[in-house]
């Protein structure tokens, strides 16, 4: 069967694959469009396996919020910042985030095995593998989290075009623009200052005991002549200072250093006749904790050439 330019164009639009790849697929399958799509999928999977050894440490974080009540945050990684800014990649990440917000998956493995909402004949993993083939880089759906505000609101914040994403969950009996704007400011605080806990009540006794042990050793080394009662007071002061840095509500509010974040939230709540309590936050930063692989140039060229 003769392969026409129109057939190649149609297959390209269906799959996003390159022109020569589409022409080859149609030739190999005698012009059968469905078989050609399957041929490209199989070819894409082979390419994806070769690319899987490369480190995907760039990418973006995306958030999706439904009705101010349910939200999802996802991190999807690429190998390069160039691809992270690509519309094809960003559209895929948005589709992943939209699927997460509707998903009941308990973990990443379960999510990857779900039917892909855009084409239920595929799984999420299949969709990822196909996107790897189209984009030409190793991609990785690294993590996600879904949150719900049963008695309040969820507010998102994205910083740096997706480099950092934050969700803040709050219980509130008033939901208006002022309350949501204040919670967005809190989300910006989380992005900038990276707290570990909402409040001191969340800090475990094990963590406190561990920190006290470290601070005690430091204080004794720095002040060997001081009595135990003085050392104890020093430890308490240092621990309080540390807690003010790692607990969101105790942090100095970056937009007004006269207030803590907790006092800022209380101030806005009072102005709006509301009761507002921040109950949870989630912060994802692209690539955090991923060790980037460094190859010499010759090895990189050889790897990409399949040598």
Model-found features: residue ranges?
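N-terminal assembly/interaction segments in proteins that build large macromolecular machines
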Residues: 2-307
């Amino acid at each position: 069967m003769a392969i026409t330019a129109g057939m190649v164009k149609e297959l390209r639009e269906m799959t996003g694959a390159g022109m020569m790849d589409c022409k080859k697929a149609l030739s190999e399958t005698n012009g059968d469009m469905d078989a050609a799509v399957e041929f490209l999928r199989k070819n894409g999977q082979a390419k994806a396996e070769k690319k899987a050894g490369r480190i995907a440490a760039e990418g973006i974080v995306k958030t999706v919020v439904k009705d101010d009540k349910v939200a999802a945050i996802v991190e999807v990684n690429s190998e390069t910042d160039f691809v992270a800014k690509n519309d094809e990649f960003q559209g895929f990440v948005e589709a992943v985030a939209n699927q997460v917000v509707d998903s009941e998956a308990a973990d990443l493995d379960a999510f990857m095995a779900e039917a892909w909402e855009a084409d239920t004949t595929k799984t999420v993993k299949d969709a990822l593998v196909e996107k790897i083939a189209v984009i030409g880089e190793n991609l990785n759906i690294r993590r996600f989290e879904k949150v719900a505000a049963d008695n309040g609101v969820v507010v998102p914040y994205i910083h740096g075009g997706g480099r950092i994403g934050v969700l803040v969950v709050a219980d509130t009996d008033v939901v208006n623009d002022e309350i949501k704007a204040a919670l967005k400011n809190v989300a910006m605080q989380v992005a900038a200052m990276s707290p570990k806990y909402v409040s001191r009540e969340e800090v475990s006794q094990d963590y406190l005991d561990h920190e006290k042990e470290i601070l005690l050793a430091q204080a004794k080394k720095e002040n060997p002549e001081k009595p135990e009662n003085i050392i104890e007071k020093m430890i308490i002061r240092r621990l309080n200072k540390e807690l003010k840095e790692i607990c969101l509500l105790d942090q100095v509010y970056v937009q007004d250093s006269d207030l803590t974040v907790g006092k800022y939230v209380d101030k806005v709540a009072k102005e709006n006749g509301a009761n507002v309590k921040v109950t949870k936050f989630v912060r994802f930063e692209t690539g955090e904790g991923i060790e980037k692989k460094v190859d010499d140039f010759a090895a990189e060229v050889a790897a990409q050439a399949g040598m």
